[in-house]
């Protein structure tokens, strides 16, 4: 079968021009650290400086990984993460116990957390969470209802 809808991050190199997209949420990726283990400053941190620490990020095939590698490449830097996982929750857990500096979407952060967001001198561009549907597919009534319900909770 084929999927009626795709919920994914954008930019996404796997989505061609044959998809209609709807922005669900705007967000920024942030690097976070437990300051008990990493002496990050309240001043702005350069991307180059981040490379001196163990970086925790999503797996290489994720749109987030692709996006981050491109952002570092744009500054003539090569991003070599220490750990690559398939879960933002696990990245946050590892950062909390001091195993590295994690890169996660800002909406994953909680107030009063042990983690401190790093202020970057070279801010990362914002991204979107989008809903995509293929131009050639007719969206079913069930999918339309799902879209209504899904967008109402965001």
Task: Describe the predicted segments one by one.
Residues 39, 53-75, 139-143, 147:
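Secondary-structure junction motif
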Residues 6, 55, 100-102:
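Short, well-ordered beta-strand core segments
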Residues 57-58, 84, 102, 132:
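Active-site-adjacent beta-strand anchor residues
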Residues 2, 64-116:
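Hydrophobic hinge/microswitch elements
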Residues 119-154:
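A late-sequence structural motif
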Residues 1-53, 107-110, 124:
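Acidic, Gly/Pro-rich loop/turn segments at junctions of secondary structure
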